[in-house]
From Swiss-Prot:
Assigned protein family: Belongs to the SHMT family.
Subcellular location: Cytoplasm
Stored InterPro entries: PyrdxlP-dep_Trfase, PyrdxlP-dep_Trfase_major, PyrdxlP-dep_Trfase_small, Ser_HO-MeTrfase, Ser_HO-MeTrfase-like, Ser_HO-MeTrfase_PLP_BS, SHMT-like_dom
Residues of the site described as Plays an important role in substrate specificity: H230
Residues with the N6-(pyridoxal phosphate)lysine modification: K231
Organism (species): Acidobacterium capsulatum (strain ATCC 51196 / DSM 11244 / BCRC 80197 / JCM 7670 / NBRC 15755 / NCIMB 13165 / 161)
Record's protein name: Serine hydroxymethyltransferase
GO molecular function: glycine hydroxymethyltransferase activity; pyridoxal phosphate binding
Superkingdom, taxonomy of origin: Bacteria
Alphabetical GO biological process terms: glycine biosynthetic process from serine; tetrahydrofolate interconversion
Keyword Cytoplasm listed: yes
Keyword Lipoprotein: no
């Protein structure tokens, strides 16, 4: 083995090593409030960085196209079995590289190109893969969309049913990326059955809440359920498909060889670890605390005069109308970033502003909850958000808030064993 193979990252590539160290400090010293982000455990990090990254394993356990897959089979079977146990599903495919690829494979397992799909409009909280014209879903399928009412900013299921009757979709999609309320899965299944459609639920954002019992499960109602494995589930960035046994063969063929070649065995190992963590009793407390924190934060921001889309949240996320205060979402994102609070700009329902300068911001609580923060911290964070937005053009004020944010972050330490090298670099 060459000497280069035994070099540390810092020795082999100091530029990448420095970027990682700086990212470690960024994550520790700030408040991560992007709703789709979280912090994985040390065990998940170790599995994701394991020697399984070297292994090719096309096919499925016991049916591989390569030799030497006996231990790859072990971790994939562990991941599949744990996913089924966690969500009460009959079948699980843990090979999708991402939520988008999970959706693509799931769609192609039950419908054909040119068929009609009915999903939540992206502008009302849906996702690109639910029918956006620039996405594969909008190019391969005929797209119909449902949205939220203008007065309540929640889904009108009578209107959804009327659209389904009119459009006759082959598949109805539940789930989204910026909808703060619980979907009525039972009603959606009734509508799907009425028009002869499949019901697919994309629970990427709230899968961890489902796993922890803090959110109703779509599994008993949907023909197929897809999800990412990060976000509230607190695993590696990847995908997962759950389905009834009758769809298992079609789903598996659609993933491999339909969408992908070899799976990422090191990521399947990390998924297995994350699923085991989510099966532990303390994960239920974690999931409920995410929701409690989100509600406390939304209430605190509302108390400061900010309009919360739909009036609140039932999940881990909320949308804030900052344009009502004369602030663009892009301006709010930038100001909060300078204050050490990471959020993302986001359109709100019936937004008249362009996508890159929308009227809202999206905020989530999974990552802060992972660090151990609770309702008291949410109230303080709300005050910082309000102050940063009010003083968005005052660099010294934003810097002062950032200092206070870092003081709080230090009370909830993150990745201490990694920070040793990062802090040495900073010195």
């Amino acid at each position: 083995m060459s000497d280069r193979m035994s070099l540390s990252l810092a020795q082999s590539d100091p530029d990448v090593a420095a970027a990682i160290d700086h990212e470690v400090l960024r994550q520790h010293e700030g408040l991560e409030m992007i709703a789709s982000e979280n912090f994985v455990s040390r065990a998940v990090l170790e599995a994701a960085g394991s020697v399984f990254t070297n292994k090719y394993a096309e096919g499925y356990p016991g049916r591989r196209y390569y030799g030497g897959c006996e231990f790859a089979d072990v971790v994939e079977n562990l991941a599949r079995d744990r996913a089924k146990q966690l969500f009460g599903a009959e079948h699980a495919n843990v090979q999708p590289h991402s939520g988008s690829q999970a959706n693509a494979a799931a769609y192609m397992s039950i419908i054909q190109p040119g068929d009609t799909i009915l999903g939540l409009d992206l502008a009302h909280g849906g996702h690109l893969t639910h029918g956006h014209k620039l996405n594969f879903s909008g190019k391969l399928y005929r797209v119909a969309s449902y949205g939220v009412r203008k007065d309540t900013e929640t889904i009108d299921y009578d209107e959804l049913e009327a659209i389904a009757v009119r459009e006759q979709p082959k598949m109805i999609i539940g789930g989204g990326s910026a909808y703060p309320r619980i979907f009525d899965f039972a009603r959606m299944r009734q509508i799907a059955d009425k028009v002869g459609a499949f019901l697919l639920v994309d629970m990427a954002h709230f899968a961890g809440l489902v796993a922890g019992g803090a959110h109703p499960s779509p599994v008993p109602h949907a023909h197929i359920v897809t999800t990412t494995t990060h976000k509230t589930l607190r695993g590696p960035r990847s995908g997962l498909i759950l389905c009834r046994q009758e769809h298992a063969a079609a789903v598996d063929k659609s993933v491999f060889p339909g969408q992908q070649g070899g799976p990422l065995v090191h990521i399947m190992a990390a998924k297995a670890v994350a699923f085991r963590e989510a099966l532990q009793p303390d994960f239920s407390k974690y999931a409920q605390q995410i929701v409690d924190n989100a509600r406390a934060l939304a209430a605190a921001l509302a108390g400061h005069g900010y309009r919360i889309i739909s009036g609140g949240t039932d999940t881990h996320l909320m949308l804030i109308d900052v344009f009502a205060k004369g602030i663009l979402g892009s301006e709010a994102e930038a100001a909060l970033g300078k204050a050490g609070i990471t959020v993302n700009k986001n359109a709100i329902p019936y937004d008249t502003n362009p996508p890159l300068k929308p009227s809202g911001i999206r905020i989530g609580t999974p990552a802060l909850t992972t660090r151990g923060m609770k309702e008291a911290e949410m109230k303080q964070i709300a005050q910082w958000i309000v102050s940063a937005l009010e003083h968005r053009n005052n660099e010294s004020m934003l810097e002062r808030i950032h200092g206070e944010v870092t003081e709080m972050a230090n009370q909830f330490p993150l990745y201490g064993w990694l920070r040793e090298d990062a802090e040495a670099l900073a010195r």
